[in-house]
Structure formats: structure tokens, C-alpha cells
A protein has these predicted regions:
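Extended basic (Lys/Arg/His-rich) segments that typically form rRNA-contacting surfaces
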Residues: 1-239
């Protein structure tokens, strides 16, 4: 089990050995410093606290500086805790870099989705409009009926409505690492990652054991079966 803190750089694309385009998200992962180590004997569970991104001391509170000074670590802007099975292998002051992961690893990436402010039900929940004619007005983008009257005299849970959109913690599971650049501390993961450019993300080894099949994973290298169908059987069906 491995983990690291990073920032989203943006999206790009990488070509594999077959010339196929792989959309990737580039993440600046680490370097992170182990600030605290928790053990099952003392705290009841094994975990480590990582610090990321240096910051001036004046930006932190006295309790935060006391916590970092106790560990002998320079001031850090972000502190995050990870439950790791191999927490015993890490010690306070150790540096965790991008080369902790390798190409082919599957990870879960957690970030904060982009905030869109106060939005209506059409944009927020993809609700449908009322008819533009035949008495559908005067308001066409409202939420519609909220429920019954005397019975049940309430709005059922799950009813969509207007409100704050985005700015939620989102975790994308089972993203495979396509490329790792240890010199620049960059990790390229397949697909999209929540949050804007520069947003904080947490990368951790996936908790799921199954693997997601990609769109091109079932395509055969045999040109006669490139479409996934047997041409002989296909021709027999047309006769």
C-alpha cells in the first residue's frame, strides 16, 4: 500500500507502442515528508501523516508549527493522513517521491471537483424543462412538483433542487499509471482526475482487486478479427 500527495498539472496524451492515443492526467506528486507515524500499539491503527509543499512559517498557526517542530520537519502547507499497511517501514523525516509508484500500478485519486456556484436543477441535475407550449410556462427551468399535499405532507429524500454545484470530494478508482518521471516528480495516470489545474490530489494504491477493461483491451492483434467478429461466420450469416 502506497500513498502520496500531489497537485494536478493538467491533461495531455501519450502514444503507446501500437500508436494508440492514451488520454492522461499529469500530476506533480511530492516530494512529501513523513511528519507523524501512528502505530497500532499506541493509536490503535497503523498510519502515516505526510506533509507537502513548503510554506513560510508565518502562514501557519502556533499549534501547527509546534506539531512540525516536534517532528523536525520544515513548515508544510498540506498535512494528510493515510492508513497504510506498511506504515512500519516509514519513519518520521523520510521523503516520499513519485518513484514510490511504478508504471502499471493501479491507484485511487481523490480531489475536490470544480465549483460552479449556485445552479438550477437543469444544469445541476440534468433535469428536463417543462413544455415550451401547451401550458408549460411561465417558468420552464424550475424543479416542478415537490410532492403531494396532505399525504405524505413532506418532500421525499432524493428530490433534486437548486443549490451549490461542485466543490465536492470525489474519488476516481482504478486509474492505471501510464508513466512516471522520477526526476520531475511527475505521474501520468490514464483518464481524468477531479479538480482544476493546480488542485490538490491524493494518490493511493487502489482498494479494489478487480481491473477495469479499457476500450481497446478486447481488440485482437489478428487483422481478420480486428472488429471482434469472425469474418467467416459473418459471411455465412449474410448468405
Amino acid at each position: 500500500m502506497k500513498a502520496i500527495i500531489g497537485k494536478k498539472v493538467g491533461m495531455s496524451q501519450i502514444f503507446d507502442e501500437n500508436g494508440k492515443v492514451i488520454p492522461v492526467t499529469v500530476i506533480e506528486a511530492g516530494p512529501c515528508t513523513v511528519v507523524q507515524k501512528k502505530t497500532a500499539e499506541k493509536e490503535g491503527y497503523a498510519a502515516v501523516q505526510l506533509g507537502y509543499e513548503d510554506v513560510p512559517e508565518r502562514k501557519l498557526t502556533k499549534p501547527e508549527m509546534g506539531h512540525l517542530n516536534k517532528a523536525g520537519v520544515a513548515p508544510k502547507k498540506y498535512l494528510r493522513e493515510f492508513d497504510l499497511e506498511n506504515a512500519a517501514e516509514l519513519n518520521v523525516g523520510d521523503i516520499v517521491k513519485a518513484d514510490t509508484f511504478k508504471e502499471g500500478d493501479f491507484v485511487d485519486v481523490t480531489g475536490t471537483s470544480k465549483g460552479h456556484g449556485y445552479q438550477g436543477v437543469v444544469k445541476r441535475w440534468n433535469a428536463g424543462r417543462t413544455p415550451m407550449s401547451h401550458g408549460g410556462g411561465p417558468v420552464h427551468r424550475h424543479a416542478g412538483s415537490m410532492g403531494s399535499t396532505t399525504d405524505p405532507s413532506r418532500i421525499f429524500k432524493g428530490k433534486v433542487g437548486a443549490g451549490q454545484m461542485g466543490c465536492d470530494q470525489v474519488t476516481i478508482q482504478n486509474l492505471d499509471i501510464v508513466k512516471v518521471d522520477p526526476e520531475l516528480n511527475l505521474i501520468a495516470v490514464r483518464g481524468a482526475v477531479p479538480g482544476p489545474k493546480g488542485g490538490l490530489v491524493l494518490i493511493k494504491s487502489t482498494v479494489k482487486t478487480h481491473r477495469i477493461k479499457h476500450a481497446d483491451s478486447g481488440i485482437s492483434n489478428n487483422p481478420q478479427k480486428a472488429s471482434g467478429r469472425n469474418p467467416q461466420k459473418a459471411s455465412a450469416r449474410t448468405k
